């Protein structure tokens, strides 16, 4: 319980510098959040096996969807899909690569990506799209959490590499990673995409959750 709690605290600390603005009075066609908050009117999901992307819409208004490999690369000249009203819609995007989308209606626009990544690791989630009390959003594709990275397939690693993932912080103990207890606990080393340049070990043991060493590591930002 303490371990899970601390993981959340660390992730929120790291997220403090990755917010983007949402200006309610911004009427320009920009790549980002603007106008009315419509972030809850649509969502992206991907099939875990095929990695096929689907858009789910929960608004009766006409809408447009634009796509790019990152928020900065979204092509606003040509929508990848348009519609009028609610429904689920298959997306013609590369199944092997991550995409970020901009969903737009007459009322506003919002960035979208799949919350639960289509990989074999349990509960691998993007923490992007979360709105804070100041009306700003965590950037998609900048901060993730997962319970494990030792069961990744080659397809999973290729997909994760397309996110540009660079830093991984492992909270597990040496025994959890290397195995122990006379073989009762098998070794479970992480499988990391080629883009990762900064792997960190930050062991969380019972009793050291709020130790000076842990707090100091967090304060330095692990970068």
Locate the predicted segments by residue.
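Bacterial N-terminal signal peptides that target proteins for export
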Residues: 1-9
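Cys-dependent protein tyrosine phosphatase-like superfamily
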Residues: 23-223
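Outer/extracellular conduits and scaffolds centered on Gram-negative outer-membrane beta-barrels
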Residues: 11-14
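C-terminal motif of bacterial Sec signal peptides marking the signal peptidase cleavage site
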Residues: 18-21
């Amino acid at each position: 319980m303490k371990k899970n709690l601390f993981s959340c605290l660390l992730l929120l600390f790291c997220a403090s510098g990755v917010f983007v603005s949402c200006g309610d009075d911004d009427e320009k066609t920009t790549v980002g959040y603007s106008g009315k908050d419509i972030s809850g009117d649509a969502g992206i999901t991907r099939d875990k096996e095929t990695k096929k992307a689907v858009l789910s819409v929960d608004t009766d208004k006409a809408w447009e969807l634009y796509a790019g490999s990152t928020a900065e690369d979204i092509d606003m000249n040509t929508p990848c899909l348009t519609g009028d009203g609610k429904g689920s819609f298959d997306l013609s995007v590369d199944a092997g690569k991550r995409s970020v989308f901009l969903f737009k209606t007459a009322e506003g626009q919002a960035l979208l990506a799949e919350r639960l990544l289509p990989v074999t690791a349990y509960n691998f989630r993007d923490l992007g799209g979360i709105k804070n009390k100041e009306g700003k959003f965590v950037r998609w594709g900048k901060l993730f959490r997962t319970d494990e990275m030792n069961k990744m397939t080659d397809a999973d690693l290729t997909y994760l590499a397309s996110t540009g993932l660079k830093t991984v912080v492992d909270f597990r103990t040496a025994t959890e990673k290397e195995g122990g207890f006379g073989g009762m606990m098998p070794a479970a080393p992480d499988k990391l995409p080629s883009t990762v340049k900064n792997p960190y070990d930050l062991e969380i043991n019972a009793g050291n959750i709020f130790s000076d060493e842990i707090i100091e590591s967090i304060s330095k930002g692990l970068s």
